[in-house]
Amino acid sequence: MAAKDVKFGNDARIKMLRGVNILADAVKVTLGPKGRNVVLDKSFGSPTITKDGVSVAREIELEDKFENMGAQMVKEVASKANDAAGDGTTTATVLAQSIITEGLKAVAAGMNPMDLKRGIDKAVIAAVEELKKLSVPCSDSKAIAQVGTISANSDSTVGELIAQAMEKVGKEGVITVEEGSGLQDELDVVEGMQFDRGYLSPYFINKPETGSIELESPFILLADKKISNIREMLPVLEAVAKAGKPLLIIAEDVEGEALATLVVNTMRGIVKVAAVKAPGFGDRRKAMLQDIATLTAGTVISEEIGLELEKTTLEDLGQAKRVVINKDTTIIIDGVGDEAAIQGRVAQIRQQIEEATSDYDKEKLQERVAKLAGGVAVIKVGAATEVEMKEKKARVEDALHATRAAVEEGVVAGGGVALIRAASAITAAGLKGDNEDQNVGIKVALRAMESPLRQIVVNAGEEASVIANNVKAGSGSYGYNAYSEEYGDMIAMGILDPTKVTRSALQYAASIAGLMITTECMITDLPRDDKGADMGAGGMGGMGGMGGMM
């Protein structure tokens, strides 16, 4: 086992604080509308330019192991805030730095660290309650656009794109961000249910100009089996032909004479048919077939539950307004399924999401909810260069997370104002700890709640104390707009923060800062002395002369 280096008390805390400050100072330059960029060197490819706090934090590793421990613990704050709400990483880092700095001063002055932590925790619990009171629901697309704009560093086009996407696919819909091919940002929306399976034969194509199949008001046959014998299909085909409507077959596979007969019937115009494979594999395929059945008011023909193809009637078939199939995808638009049944199915899948343990399962279940409840939107980010593309894509993803958080828990006044109002309310209510040391802990937390506003103002090149006092003197959503350099109602100016982002930033900052304040000893590996080993290996250089031995 390697020898250890151990530091105690103040020596340990000073080193730890130095590491915290190096990381936090690098991250906090990005805060606010006038925050600056940070350039990250990459071992291959061009450097990355970012204004995303967590991306900066992840890059930092310090040479001194004790300082690095401090930096890594604050990095955890940014990561946790990012995981919980997808944004607010810089705010969380600024809060943590302030709590740690003030807390360690109090420890150095002889306060009990455990009581300080208890005081900080009390203040944070009270602040979270105040934030909930200040929160207003975020329901209209204007508010969603404003949240997206603020999170994307005052880029209004991004905010509007996200608001449009949410309007189209609903709050449950899946919105993904991809790299585009042009200079402009684009929004592609797929309404209805889309799955990644294309036509089984190009002979089904009825729109040669687009290479796709379009079926108007089709019947939909869902079969959880391979279909290779056309005899099984005859009763259904005859019934559909009589009804004069097209038929979409979604089965495990359609092959052999069954596929050939369907193609011939389609080409002769006897009955218009298209066949695709069912999406997914194994149990997931069964579940997705059931989703499609719910959406189209059909029944999955499965021998497991005693249903056979020969006995299938028109009542067992699903229906939709329109189906579009191309080489790789199938889209079912406006299924005739009962709304209550669809919502019941969505609730059932949501329950499975809560019980799922792996991220992969959760993601797949979330996709199923989106396909049933809303649709899928793809935001394609446009930029002139690859460096700009990466930076912009990261901003759009951040903004998307922020808008989701806003829809979930509502919004509060942005620009650090909500935390200042929460702190003022706690002071007015006269929150007290069990002893004087806890009271100091409460003061440490309340002072830290001013730090995001102060940092936004510093980054804008203004005097922090003057502006912080002016904002504190106001009430409600009155604050300072660093972008336009004017005071006013933050909500009216469209400067909003998601409540969830502000809450998560404060909770994670206080949690990790509280643990760091109570640290009394730090242990790390001593650096290995490799000099002797290097010299030994270097001495072998003389072996080159052995060539003469040949």
From Swiss-Prot:
It holds the Pfam family Cpn60_TCP1. GO terms for molecular function: ATP binding; ATP-dependent protein folding chaperone; isomerase activity; unfolded protein binding. One of its GO terms (cellular component) is cytoplasm. It is found in: Cytoplasm. Coiled coil: none annotated. The keyword Chaperone applies. It catalyses: ATP + H2O + a folded polypeptide = ADP + phosphate + an unfolded polypeptide. PROSITE patterns: CHAPERONINS_CPN60. One of its GO terms (biological process) is protein refolding. Its EC number is 5.6.1.7. ATP binds at residues 30-33, 51, 87-91, 415, 497. Forms a cylinder of 14 subunits composed of two heptameric rings stacked back-to-back. Interacts with the co-chaperonin GroES. PANTHER family: 60 KDA HEAT SHOCK PROTEIN, MITOCHONDRIAL. Belongs to the chaperonin (HSP60) family. This is Chaperonin GroEL. It comes from Yersinia enterocolitica. The lineage of its organism: Bacteria, Pseudomonadati, Pseudomonadota, Gammaproteobacteria, Enterobacterales. The gene is groEL.
